[in-house]
Amino acid sequence: MTKSELIESLAGKYPHLSPRDIEHAIKEMIGCMSEALAGGERIEIRGFGSFSLHHRPPRVGRNPKTGESVHLPSRRVPHFKPGKELRDRVNSIKD
């Protein structure tokens, strides 16, 4: 699902809200979450999951074009851990 599909879906469920208002709310929510993660905070949304930062240690990579070894510095990367309710809901889907 893309952001525009999410906006369409929410606009269908909440006809009293304009798609523009929904888009602004989604952008604001994503902005707040991004700022919190950039500040090192953990975000927990009960029933959905949590976002946190994980440390990735430095390593030696390889340039795929030249085959040359390249030193990659350590970095923090966003990590999502799904909550129990989300895991259960996804696992209940029949293939």
UniProtKB/Swiss-Prot annotation:
InterPro entries: Hist_DNA-bd (IPR000119), Histone-like_DNA-bd_CS (IPR020816), IHF-like_DNA-bd_dom_sf (IPR010992), IHF_beta (IPR005685). It comes from the Bacteria. GO terms for cellular component: chromosome; cytosol. GO terms for molecular function: DNA binding; structural constituent of chromatin. Residues 82-95 have a biased composition (Basic and acidic residues). CDD domains: IHF_B. PROSITE patterns: HISTONE_LIKE. Residues 52-95 are annotated as: Disordered. Keywords: DNA recombination, DNA-binding, Transcription, Transcription regulation, Translation regulation. Gene3D superfamilies: IHF-like DNA-binding proteins. One of its GO terms (biological process) is regulation of translation. Heterodimer of an alpha and a beta chain. This protein is one of the two subunits of integration host factor, a specific DNA-binding protein that functions in genetic recombination as well as in transcriptional and translational control. PANTHER family: DNA-BINDING PROTEIN HU, INTEGRATION HOST FACTOR SUBUNIT BETA. Belongs to the bacterial histone-like protein family. HAMAP family: IHF_beta (MF_00381). This is Integration host factor subunit beta. It comes from Methylococcus capsulatus (strain ATCC 33009 / NCIMB 11132 / Bath).
